[in-house]
UniProtKB/Swiss-Prot annotation:
It comes from the Bacteria. Part of the 50S ribosomal subunit. Binds to the 23S rRNA. It comes from Shewanella sediminis (strain HAW-EB3). Residues 21-31 have a biased composition (Gly residues). This is Large ribosomal subunit protein uL15. Keywords: Ribonucleoprotein, Ribosomal protein, RNA-binding, rRNA-binding. NCBIfam families: rplO_bact (TIGR01071). Residues 1-49 are annotated as: Disordered. GO terms for biological process: translation. The gene is rplO.
């Protein structure tokens, strides 16, 4: 095999459709767009979700729910990731310093996923029941 003999596999590349090149090509004159109408025009076509004037499904269905603004600034931290935190005290600033959460995060919750070997003190963070049990089993403690 040489660089000058490399080529795509047979049938892997199809030739571009050449339109407007005569009747015999199959895509002459109207170029496969048919006659007249919105879709035949340059830049023609309908927007996404348009149903021809019928009330669209998106509008027929009721609104529901909302986007919690608190959820945007809340993060989950796995218990196994606490090993990356320097020191024995884990708080929001320690998580930010260890790059476990981004700078805009204001609230964090520690969840049970993985294991923890060293004892740590968790301050000012929410902790799930399972994570609380695992931290205390490792000799750590949780301070509200």
């Amino acid at each position: 095999m040489r660089l000058n003999t490399l080529s795509p596999a047979a049938g892997a590349k199809s030739a571009a459709k050449r339109v407007g090149r005569g009747i015999g090509s199959g895509t002459g004159k109207t170029c496969g767009r048919g006659h007249k109408g919105q879709k035949s025009r340059s830049g023609g076509g309908v927007r996404v979700g348009f149903e021809g004037g019928q009330m669209p499904l998106k509008i027929r269905l009721p609104k529901f729910g909302f986007t919690s603004r608190r959820a945007l600034v809340t993060a989950e931290v796995r218990i196994s990731e606490l090993a990356k935190v320097n020191g024995d005290v884990v708080d929001l600033n320690a998580l930010k310093d260890a790059n476990l959460v981004t700078r805009n995060i204001q609230f964090a919750k520690i969840v049970l996923s993985g294991t923890i070997e060293r004892p740590v003190t968790v301050k000012g963070l929410k902790v799930t029941k399972g994570a609380r049990a695992a931290i205390e089993a490792a000799g750590g403690k949780i301070e509200e």
